[in-house]
């Protein structure tokens, strides 16, 4: 009897590759694939524990993964899911900022990440408010007819 062993090597992509694939899927409106790739990117980045290891580049990659998922869900009008991916990093960053002394060199990276997150949330809220306003205007115009 002959036994043949087949060795399969599974190539794990890094978070940058997942984001690149996610972006490609997003631009082609392949929402399910984009969500999967962005989710895998987020999972890969979270393994690096950006807040614990105080790595600014990984911290911003982590934040970008959340924002990509938020943008993906917002483009599909899944606003509560989008909001989740905007709120979650802000909550973690806020807690971490509260536990980090201002003279810690990583404090500035945390603060910048928090500001970036707040800006994204403000843009989301502005878009939601303009959507609500335009919907209300359309309904009012329909009622007037």
Residue ranges and their predicted role:
Residues 2-9, 47-60, 95-112, 126, ...:
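Acidic, Ser/Thr-rich low-complexity linear motifs
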Residues 112-145:
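Terminal, low-structured helical/coil segments at or just beyond the last alpha-helical repeat
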Residues 18, 59-62, 66, 111-114, ...:
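TPR repeat positional signature
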Residues 18-19, 26:
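Alpha-helical tetratricopeptide repeat
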Residues 35, 39-50, 88-98:
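Amphipathic alpha-helical segments of tetratricopeptide repeats
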């Amino acid at each position: 009897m002959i036994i043949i062993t087949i060795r399969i090597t599974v190539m794990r992509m890094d978070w940058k590759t997942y984001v690149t694939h996610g972006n490609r899927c997003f631009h082609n409106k392949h929402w399910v694939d984009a969500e999967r790739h962005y989710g895998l990117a987020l999972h890969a980045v979270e393994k690096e524990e950006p807040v614990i290891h105080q790595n600014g580049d990984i911290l911003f990659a982590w934040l970008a993964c959340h924002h990509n998922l938020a943008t993906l869900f917002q483009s599909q009008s899944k606003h509560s899911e989008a909001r989740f991916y905007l709120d979650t990093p802000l909550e973690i960053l806020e807690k971490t900022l509260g536990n980090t002394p201002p003279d810690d060199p990583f404090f500035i990276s945390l603060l910048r990440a928090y500001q970036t997150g707040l800006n994204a949330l403000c843009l989301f809220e502005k878009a939601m408010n303009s959507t609500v306003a335009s919907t209300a205007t359309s309904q009012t115009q329909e009622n007037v007819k």
